[in-house]
């Protein structure tokens, strides 16, 4: 009986040892809600790597989104979307601070901007 119990424990241990321990992570998601004259981010901080930035327009005007890493020159854009619409941007984020702005008319000057922190 002891031999059977030992055999079962050994088989169970071997079965779990063969199972990969690394979890595959998909892209992180950040929803940017556009209102009259503010952005609300679903999260203020994400890990570096693949990300999906979704702009959802709950406002009454058209809005867009321009994303730029502080100290960087590259810009990512979501074109103007109508009220009630949404659009998604897929990108790979490096550590640092990213500024988000609505570049429609004077929206950014009126407060339609936010900051996203990307950590290691």
Please report, for each region that a protein language model flagged, where it lies by residue.
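Short loop/turn segments at connectors of secondary-structure elements within structured domains
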Residues: 26, 49, 59-63, 110-112
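Surface-exposed, proline-enriched loop/turn segments that connect beta strands in immunoglobulin-like
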Residues: 40-42, 76
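Beta-strand cores of secreted/periplasmic/IMS beta-sandwich domains, seen most often
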Residues: 42-61, 87-101
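Solvent-exposed strand-loop boundary residues in beta-sheet-rich modules
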Residues: 69-71, 108
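Surface-exposed loop/edge segments in extracytoplasmic proteins
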Residues: 72-79
């Amino acid at each position: 009986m002891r031999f059977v119990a030992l055999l079962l424990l050994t088989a169970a241990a071997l079965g779990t040892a063969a199972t990969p321990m690394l979890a595959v992570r998909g892209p992180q998601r950040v929803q940017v809600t556009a209102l009259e004259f503010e952005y609300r981010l679903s999260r203020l901080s994400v890990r570096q790597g693949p990300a999906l930035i979704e702009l959802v327009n709950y406002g009454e005007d058209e809005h867009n989104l321009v994303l730029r890493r502080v100290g960087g020159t590259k810009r990512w854009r979501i074109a103007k979307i109508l009220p009630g619409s949404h659009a998604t941007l897929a990108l790979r984020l490096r550590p640092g601070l990213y500024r988000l702005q609505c570049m429609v008319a004077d929206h950014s000057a009126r407060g339609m901007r936010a900051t996203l922190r990307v950590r290691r």
